[in-house]
Amino acid sequence: FEVIVKSDNVCLAFLYKGINTMDSMVGYKNDKYLYFGRCAAKLDDVANFIPARITGLVMIAAAYFVNLDAKRGWKTFCRDRYTHVSPNSAMTESVAAGALNIQLGGGHFYFGKWVHKDTIGDDIRPVKAEDIVTTNNLLYMTAILSLILFALIYLLRIFPVV
């Protein structure tokens, strides 16, 4: 029986967490951390490239299971998944916006300066406070389906179907 936790996997997990933490701390654009922050942000983009896309696809299935508009989630994902400065951020944001029939994003103040950003999703209905609970349910179902998906992949590695 294969041991699940190997030392190289643990090292990769620590490396990933370090990259993610660096991006959170200094990955934004300002004069003080411009180059160091840019390096952290690019490393984070590379580390999350595949996981962001897998999560977006799993979230579309999750939208179906929590009775949201999975079809619109798919359409919005296909159209708006690159509508963000980060190559990964809009992957799940576009699915959530489409599944909830709302529009997200747009301009905002960032460190006291107005920053223009494109919107994600369609302005079909106004955003409501209850959308937070609905989005949390979408998040939980996405996590459950991801766990099932990767457990099945792991089991197929242990017990290959020939």
Task: List the predicted regions and their residue ranges.
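Hydrophobic alpha-helical transmembrane segments
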Residues: F1-M22, G27-V162
